[in-house]
């Protein structure tokens, strides 16, 4: 029972009237991710955060710069009345944070302490850093 071998061409490919249906890529096709829209939302708190810089395109961790805010001033008034004025610079957890790109130096985000009467934040006390893997 030998079968005769015939050449099979395969499934015929029919192209329609639209050239894009024939496999041509349209000229306005978007390849990859758009550069201006963030893929994920970065939460900027008082620790370095992973980010994508909108100015230079760098990917990495932000550099933090601390600036005294209202919460730091109110918290420093209490020890100052008791004579402990050396505690003012050591209360870094109450200072506002500015996140900067390490490559170009542009400011990426601000994190401000919103409640001047809150000296410590117990629910967020053990919040893990976004920069370190869990």
From Swiss-Prot:
Gene Ontology molecular-function annotations: metal ion binding
Similarity field: Belongs to the CDIP1/LITAF family.
Q: What this chain does, per the record? A: Acts as a membrane anchor, bringing other regulators of programmed cell death (PCD) to the plasma membrane. Negatively regulates hypersensitive cell death.
Tell me the organism.
Arabidopsis thaliana
What is stated about domains? The LITAF domain is stabilized by a bound zinc ion. The LITAF amphipathic helix region (68-90) is necessary for plasma membrane localization. Both N-terminal (1-47) and C-terminal (114-134) domains are sufficient for the interaction with MIEL1 or with the N-terminal domain of LSD1.
Keyword check for Transcription: no
Q: Which Pfam families match?
A: zf-LITAF-like
Region entry Membrane-binding amphipathic helix, spans: 68-88
Q: Which SMART domains match?
A: LITAF
- Per the record, GO CC terms? plasma membrane
Lineage, opening ranks: Eukaryota, Viridiplantae, Streptophyta, Embryophyta, Tracheophyta
Tell me where it resides: Cell membrane
Entries under InterPro entries matching the protein: LITAF, LITAF_fam
Q: What switches on its expression?
A: Up-regulated by Pseudomonas syringae avrRpt2 and fumonisin B1 (FB1).
Would the keyword Repressor turn up in this protein's UniProt record? no
Describe its partners and assembly state: Interacts (via N- and C-terminal) with MIEL1 and LSD1 (via N-terminus).
Q: Which UniProt keywords apply?
A: Cell membrane, Membrane, Metal-binding, Zinc
Describe its membrane topology. Peripheral membrane protein
**Tell me, which GO biological process terms does this entry list?**
cellular response to hypoxia; negative regulation of plant-type hypersensitive response
Protein's name according to its UniProt entry: GSH-induced LITAF domain protein
LITAF domain: residues covered: 33-113
Q: What is its main location?
A: membrane
Transmembrane segments annotated in the record for this chain: none
Q: Which residues bind Zn(2+)?
A: 53, 56, 101, 104
């Amino acid at each position: 029972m030998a079968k005769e071998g015939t050449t099979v061409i395969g499934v015929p490919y029919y192209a329609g009237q639209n050239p894009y249906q024939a496999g041509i890529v349209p000229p306005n096709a978007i390849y990859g991710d758009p550069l201006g829209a963030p893929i994920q939302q970065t939460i900027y708190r008082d620790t370095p955060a992973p980010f994508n810089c909108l100015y230079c395109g760098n990917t990495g961790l932000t550099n933090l710069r601390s600036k005294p805010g209202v919460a730091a001033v109110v918290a420093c008034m209490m020890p100052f009345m008791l004579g402990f004025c050396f505690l003012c610079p050591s209360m870094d957890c109450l200072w506002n944070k500015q996140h900067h790109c390490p490559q170009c130096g542009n400011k990426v985000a601000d994190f401000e302490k919103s409640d001047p009467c809150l000296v410590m934040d117990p629910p967020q006390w053990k919040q893990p850093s976004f920069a370190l893997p869990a």
